[in-house]
């Protein structure tokens, strides 16, 4: 998982013919070469131990004093003296100026987004219309039935992406998770201080109304989820249990769901809840998927799913029959809940193309498209109708095992900056321009109601929120204010608001604010002509939209 080192034990292997000294007609190893091979063997052993997370290197007092100590965990989530996430501030992720969109040209997702944003069939000049021009057309009765369609509403809102910091809450330790409920009325935040905070988001507010002390927490809460009815939430940590707790009411009732793992040190890095609230899905550091049935109150499945930590799980749609998993083996797997068996753990397909471990997966909600974030510093868009070949899976596995750096505390190697496409890569699109360091950074599709899911947004190790255009692959917005990596991001399902959760201990709410000048919206050539002190921002003008169902 994000915790495990990426180094490879086999990266320093030698060909059988290397190191042989040819003397006369025979082949013998010289003493010097034997000693050299001995050193190589030790290096291989050290690389293996580092990759498995059983030991780690720490900086001593001297500039060149490196110490080898036994690791307390084999995950990214370590003790409080671990790296605080600020190294990534010095890393400037390279932006892909010319994303490869060829695979999207004839894929159905282009039509879907075009319909959802009112762009399908429009000429280039119409696509470039400003918001006032769209209003003018509506007033002239040129819109459908005299008002904006749902697609046109989404296109209007693309002019008002969040760009201004409107609220900050500060914690004493790192913020790990932060998500909106399905109806957008509650925001839930989980911090390393073992406290889960709930915020009331109704009527434009963002007011904390409850703080709950999590139980049985090892180092930090790692993931959270709401139940479909919105009355309870779940959280996971370094523990054998996933806990469920009530949101409303005076007291806090914590129920422990025992997964009964085989590992002594066990963590659930990712959780998801089925649409009927009955089953809880978890991905763990033992390479297994766990399914817990709340009605039977027992674990019903333990599936050996990945060769390394399972960092991400997600249901494909509201049917909860198709699910996704991703791990440190760089493979995303697709499972059918109806055919999952412990004695025959076979996925229905796999998606390969990443070159390092997967940190997060988000489904578009249509049981077809998903995105995955990875330690190879990319997001990939997938179509489950395009599974990868055996060649693609082997290429991804090999690339992942050959990584020889630790993303928790080392800088990104320059080779990761190159636009390399592995053989058999079946992804539709690759997005570059954000950093994935230190922790399992999340990425998500933008909401369907307000944006038509035309954007992908992600946290970043440099303390930013990065928003990509799904179809073009270009960055359309960067929100910058944090001093450490942004681990989680969440977009309000019906409003233009984004909340970022960072390792600098801050929770930040971003909204659109209109002003005469905004540097992010201005060409760099015009920057110098803008005064440093601009006019006071004013709220976005209200636009009539249909209410959410």
UniProtKB/Swiss-Prot annotation:
Pathway noted in the entry:
Protein modification; protein ubiquitination
One GO CC term, this protein: Cul4-RING E3 ubiquitin ligase complex
Q: Does the keyword Protein biosynthesis apply?
A: no
What residue spans do the WD repeats cover? 170-210, 216-258, 263-302, 305-345, 353-392, 435-480, 481-520
GO process terms (BP): cognition; exploration behavior; gene expression; memory; protein stabilization; protein ubiquitination; respiratory system process; response to oxidative stress
Which PROSITE patterns is this protein grouped with? Answer: WD_REPEATS_2 (PS50082), WD_REPEATS_REGION (PS50294)
Biased segments, Low complexity type: 1-24
> Which keywords does this Swiss-Prot/TrEMBL entry list?
Phosphoprotein, Repeat, Ubl conjugation pathway, WD repeat
Region Disordered, residue ranges: 1-40
Does the keyword section mention Ligase?
no
| InterPro entries referenced in this protein's UniProt entry, alphabetically | DCAF, DCAF11/LEC14B, G-protein_beta_WD-40_rep, WD40/YVTN_repeat-like_dom_sf, WD40_repeat_dom_sf, WD40_rpt
Q: Which residues carry this modification: Phosphoserine?
A: 73, 75
Its biological function?
A: May function as a substrate receptor for CUL4-DDB1 E3 ubiquitin-protein ligase complex.
Q: How does it assemble?
A: Interacts with DDB1 and CUL4A.
PANTHER family for this protein: DDB1- AND CUL4-ASSOCIATED FACTOR 11
The identity of this protein, by name, is: DDB1- and CUL4-associated factor 11
Organism equals: Mus musculus (Mouse)
